[in-house]
C-alpha cells in the first residue's frame, strides 16, 4: 500500500532568515549564508509561514518517503551551521618521527611534513568556506572550522586520508592525523 502524503516541518529560529525557491534552500544567520539545491529530489518544499519550512511528498515509494526526513535533517544542519558553526579537532599521532603541520594560503591549505620521516610534503586544500589552524592550547592539534558540516567533515577526512600508511602493517604503524573531537565553534549552553 502506498502512503498518500508524507510531510515534515522544520522550525526556523527567530534570528535566522530562510527562503525556498524551486527546491533551492537559502539560510542566512549570524555566521553567514548557506545555499543548497535539492533539485535532484522530487519533493514539494514551501514555507507556509515565516518560521516554518515544510517538506512534502505525495504518493512516494519507500526511498522517496525516507528522503523527506533526510532533507529536513540537512536544513537543520544548515541552520545550526549559520548559528553556531562546526568545529572538528584533529590530533597528530606519531611513534618516532614528529609530524609537522603548517597552514598556508590564508588558512585554506595545510602542508604535512616529516610523516614517517618521508621527505614528501603532503598538501591538502580545504573545501570552500573551511579554515584550518594549529591549536594554541594543545600541542599537535589542528582545528578545522566552517559553517557547512559536509565541507568541514569532508576536509577533515581529506587530511586523515592524506596520512594513510602504505606498505606497512597498519596495526603497528598508527601514525597519522585523526579526528579527536566534533563540536561547534560557538559553545552550546548545556
Curated annotation (Swiss-Prot):
Protein's name according to its UniProt entry: Large ribosomal subunit protein uL6
Top-level taxon of origin: Eukaryota
Keyword Secreted in annotation: no
Family, as annotated: Belongs to the universal ribosomal protein uL6 family.
MF terms (GO), sorted A to Z: rRNA binding; structural constituent of ribosome
GO cellular component: cytosolic large ribosomal subunit; cytosolic ribosome
Gene3D superfamilies: Ribosomal protein L6, alpha-beta domain
GO BP terms, alphabetized: cytoplasmic translation
SUPFAM superfamilies recorded: Ribosomal protein L6
Keyword annotations from UniProtKB, A to Z: Ribonucleoprotein, Ribosomal protein
Organism whose genome encodes this protein: Drosophila melanogaster
Amino acid at each position: 500500500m502506498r502512503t498518500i502524503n508524507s510531510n515534515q516541518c522544520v522550525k526556523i529560529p527567530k534570528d535566522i532568515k530562510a527562503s525556498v525557491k524551486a527546491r533551492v534552500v537559502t539560510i542566512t544567520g549570524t555566521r553567514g549564508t548557506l545555499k543548497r539545491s535539492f533539485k535532484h529530489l522530487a519533493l514539494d518544499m514551501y514555507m507556509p509561514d515565516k518560521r516554518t519550512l515544510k517538506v512534502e511528498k505525495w504518493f512516494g515509494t519507500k526511498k522517496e518517503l525516507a528522503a523527506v526526513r533526510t532533507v529536513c535533517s540537512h536544513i537543520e544542519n544548515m541552520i545550526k551551521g549559520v548559528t553556531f558553526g562546526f568545529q572538528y579537532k584533529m590530533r597528530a599521532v606519531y611513534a618516532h618521527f614528529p609530524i609537522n603541520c603548517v597552514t598556508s594560503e590564508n588558512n585554506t591549505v595545510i602542508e604535512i611534513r616529516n610523516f614517517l620521516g618521508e621527505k614528501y610534503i603532503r598538501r591538502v586544500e580545504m573545501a570552500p568556506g573551511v579554515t584550518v589552524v594549529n591549536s594554541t592550547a594543545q600541542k599537535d592539534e589542528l582545528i578545522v572550522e566552517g559553517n557547512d558540516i559536509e565541507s568541514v567533515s569532508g576536509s577533515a577526512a581529506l587530511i586523515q586520508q592524506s596520512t594513510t600508511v602504505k606498505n606497512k602493517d597498519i596495526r603497528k604503524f598508527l601514525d597519522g592525523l585523526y579526528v579527536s573531537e566534533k563540536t561547534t565553534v560557538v559553545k552550546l549552553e548545556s
